[in-house]
Amino acid sequence: YFMKEIMPLSSPTIVGKRQPFPFLKNGEIYAVVVLETRNKKERIGIIPCSNNMLTRMVELPGGKGRYMLIEDLILHYIGKVFKGYKVKGKSLLKVVRNADIDADAAYDEDLDYREFMEDLMKQRKKLSPVRIDLSREMDETVVDALCRYLDVTPDRVFRSEAPLDVSFVFQLQDLLRRNTELFYEKRVPQKSPEFKDGQSILQQITQEDKLLSY
């Protein structure tokens, strides 16, 4: 699946003198790898894990509700993308950029407000990085290099064992709907014995306190 579906659509980059460090979009996940050349020099390779042509949840063979995130799949097979190099370290990476824009101060009444907000959202994606999230520990020299490229101090680098983006949970819920045994039984609202049918609820409340639960 990786060789046929993912690898042809991947856009790998090796940072070097001829290839500057790419722009990393706010909140998107990238696979970062430390590569060793034949001359024992180290290079940083980067692959974007977001692709509109591929689903983020990949169903594993055998069914039974087993799925894998596409970024984990890319990270696992990343050595096949950078052939001719030795993989010395790898991790998923997410950059969080500053989103502090004063919309009121920047707004001009002569502009269309919808277009103005669209432009504002685009600007937010290009603002300065304030945080780097990693899924694995990486060599200190590599982390320092990432900090230097992104202009972030080392104390703003964090490692997380949890997925760097948990928005896939909603997609997972839809995929597993046929597995009813994984869900709680639907709760049916029940009438409260505190209230009498046929009488105004407000009048009953004025007569005495009522206790409800949900």
Please annotate each region the language model reported.
Residues 1-214:
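N-terminal localization/anchoring segments of enzymes in phospholipid and broader phosphate metabolism
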